[in-house]
Amino acid sequence: VQAAGDQQDTLDRVGLQPEAASRRVRTYSKGMRQKVGVAVALAKQAKALLLDEPTSGLDPKASNEFSELLVQLKNDGAAILMATHDLFRAKETGSRIGIMKDGALVRELSTDEVSHADVERIYLEHMH
């Protein structure tokens, strides 16, 4: 169990307001729920996060905040595996991009070796 100060530090780190700790999760927006999941992982000192479409359904502001959080976690040494259809977000937050088709990995790239234009072109090559 985290001490109250540690709990608030964790909530702050993921961008949740202090009153979030006293509210029921069902009252949270989708973006807040995503952040709660990351907060739980941080509280448990998880070394890896597995995320399935973490920014789908989020408004642009919440999506950007969540992506910034993922970049911070990556920079702090967390391993993050994120399944997403948003390759531009993957390029911004990841270090590697894998493109899958019919359940098979068809391409793997370093985010350093591709531009945003390349990402779209490569994606379209494999999806059609």
Show where each model-derived region lies.
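Helical segment within the ABC ATPase nucleotide-binding domain
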Residues: 64-76
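H-loop/switch region of ABC-family ATPase nucleotide-binding domains
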Residues: 84-85
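Catalytic Walker B motif of ABC-type/P-loop ATPase nucleotide-binding domains
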Residues: 49-52
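Helix N-cap at the start of a conserved alpha-helix in ABC-type nucleotide-binding domains
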Residues: 60-62
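Hydrophobic anchor residue at the start of the ABC signature
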Residues: 38
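A short, surface-exposed alpha-helical micro-motif characterized by mixed small hydrophobic
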Residues: 90-92
